[in-house]
Amino acid sequence: MDKVFPSTQESSLSLTDIKKENGLIVIFSCNTCPFVVGTEDFPGWENQYNPLYNMALKANIGFVLINSNEGKRAGVDSFEEMKSHAKKMSYQMPYLMDENSELANAMEAKTTPHVFFFDKNNKLICAGSIDNIWDNKRKKDEQYLSMAIQSVLNGKKVKPNFTAAKGCSIKRVSK
């Protein structure tokens, strides 16, 4: 958690810099995935980032977006494009560049978006999707991440704590 990453807001930050008293939420994201930015038929998840960030702040939980799309770094996921996208979307939270997809590989992140929620002791307590709006067969809407934040705030166990991550694959550099 001490590795330093280039940030669209500051020169560089580590996950330790961002973590707060009650934990840390890491969301692997990017600038182009339809699951992140949306389509005509699907709203995408990035419009939820700022409200979730504010909810996490109130619960004293750190919140960060990570772009690990090293395979697209020369184009749509370049650091300059990340800065432009963060400004366009008015991101309030840090948006970090994961060079060579090192963090994504270490955390076994698969998709954008992919959520990892760590408690105050750095234990993974929740991972997967932000919610279930992608599932056309859902019986009811479930806001997984906001429910997890609320559970931590209320001193309760996070349920469900592991859900399927839906999104675009992280574009790693082939070796």
Where in the sequence are the language-model features?
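Mature N-terminal segment immediately following signal peptide/propeptide cleavage
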Residues: 1-20
